[in-house]
Amino acid sequence: MNEFQLKYGCNPNQKPSRIFMADGSELPVEILNGRPGYINFLDAFNGYQLVKELKEATGLPAATSFKHVSPAGAAVGLPLTDVLKKIYWVDESIGELSPLACAYARARGADRMSSFGDFISLSDVCDVATAKLIQHEVSDGIIAPGYEDEALEILKSKKKGNYNIIKIDHSYKPEPIERKQVYGVTFEQGRNEFVINEELLGNVVTENKEISQQAKIDLIIALITLKYTQSNSVCYAKGGQAIGIGAGQQSRIHCTRLAGSKADNWFLRQNPKVLNLPFKENIGRADRDNAIDLYIGEDYMDVLADGEWERVFTEKPEVFTKEEKRAWLDKNTDVALGSDAFFPFGDNIERAYKSGVKYIAQPGGSIRDDNVIETCNKRNIAMCFTGMRLFHH
């Protein structure tokens, strides 16, 4: 098929709506189940580019969790620790996790509040282990280059048989020129085919020039994630995954703060106080995620007040104090950070440092680069200038 009719566009009043190939050729996708919508396809095509590039850059299977045309999480298939399995709600009954399943668990688990109702993109054929993980999550749909037979049947059972499943031709290569219309005016530009790899990290401008191999992988993950995140954007990454993404902010410091708060939450969820919260057996994942988000945040009394805690816990948990949280966050180290444009002030570095950042990749080019470098030197952070902006709109 060279076009697919959609129910509507971004909003129900925006009709007619379709996706199509302007040159009359066949669409590079098959709809295996459901009826994906306009925003679903935006998430699918942006997300698939991200995971395809992650796989090419690292050689590892990759997954991303998209919401409203920005990733909530992105990761490659490195093994999970027992703690990560617990905070990502990985059920032991699934058995051994494939690398692709690990990538999906990481991508979905980094920011579970934002990933609720996500659209999933996978770099590889969806296997049974990955499908079993997805089966238990609230999700709008998935795109992948293929599906094992049993995995496809598992996914088809979601949403009362209406789960959106898209298969994309992995050999598809888009035209080098892309176009879109705004207010009746056509915009045209070359596709962003800039390749992000280790060579991009060679210009280390700080006194500390030591960037570990794992940190290089994490910086690559952060930068590729930013390439498909609405600007301005900042991404914190650690251990093969994004752990905090700040998207669509109009000031750089707000990107850094937003992404940093998400990275902090990811690490706070690993504290024994949170791991051992006494949830009632009948409390579902979404309610647990909401309760944890409140418990580790400033509004903890919203879940600990008398009359509230009884709804989700078997007994009232102790307060996770500000001092305890700060002491725990101080243990988080070796975090990598990418920025889609230069840092204009050193305050971004100071905020990043509070969330355990030790490695930074950013374009450079600010008139205050000296101040930013000086702040990195003060905090013993290794920073490289890539010379390449990664805006995405």
Residue ranges and their predicted role:
Residues 1-200, 215-233:
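Active-site loops and adjacent core secondary-structure elements that bind or stabilize anionic groups
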Residues 53, 228, 265-269, 354, ...:
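Conserved helix-loop functional segments at active or binding sites
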Residues 57-65, 165-168, 231-238, 268-279, ...:
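Flexible, glycine/charged-enriched surface loops at secondary-structure junctions
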Residues 70, 126, 238-241, 249, ...:
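Active-site-proximal loop/turn and secondary-structure-junction residues that shape catalytic pockets
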Residues 118, 122-123, 136-166, 171-173, ...:
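C-terminal binding/interaction regions
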